[in-house]
Amino acid sequence: MKLMDRDAALQDLLEKHVFTEWIHDLALIENNFLTRQQAIEDELIAALESLCQLATLQHEQGRKGDIRYIYISLLRTRVVKNKAVYRIDAYDENWFLDETECAVEWSADFVFEPLFNRMTKLEKLKSDYARKITTMDIEQIQQIEAVKYHLLTVEFLKSQMPVFIASPSLERMPKANACTIFAGEYRDDSEILCRFTRSEGAETREGESSWIISS
């Protein structure tokens, strides 16, 4: 390999081993999902139901109000450790000022595994660049690439909202008149997955609530 300065070495690495490689990962992600589809879907719903049960318990203990927000957040600090962990939080009307923590974790490794495997290979390739590329560079590349995989995860989360909305645990959980589910990064940018609002004046059976679902 010809001698390169740091910028040239980094550009060479990106062009040869990063920029388009994520496209090849799509087939791997699809295969991961189809191989374990039922288990993957069940694990997400189980995590969400566990959150609802915890929020219901805290409400019964007088420690938390009616739930108004649910956040599903990628933990960037875990990505560095090759773990695709999402934290799922339930907040009452106090939002981030809600003092009673109500959170569970869920793993999206089935989406991120190809990324982690690629980054392991990049770590080995850096020796080809005569110390111009560092482990810190690889970690930064990983964080940038993670955005693509996070977006794929968000699409999966959206697809599972109808199942979650129909779950008994969510129905039993005390909710504000308007409740919104978000996905994003922890206490950072996020997008709405689903919003449900209590319907005023709708005919319901005794003990039931009527909700208007929107996305």
Model feature map: region roles:
Residues 1-39, 108-122:
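Short, amphipathic alpha-helical segments
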Residues 1-21, 144-215:
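Acidic, proline/glycine-rich low-complexity IDRs
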Residues 17-67:
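Short N-terminal edge-element motif at the start of the domain
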Residues 32, 36-43, 141, 145-153:
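Conserved aromatic-histidine-acidic binding/catalytic patches
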Residues 44, 72, 88, 157, ...:
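Generic structural hydrophobic/aromatic packing signal, biased to beta-strands
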Residues 54-57, 77-81, 163:
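Amphipathic alpha-helical interaction surfaces
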Residues 61-119:
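Aromatic- and glycine-enriched beta-alpha-beta binding-site module
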Residues 102-144:
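Low-complexity, serine/threonine/proline-enriched polar segments
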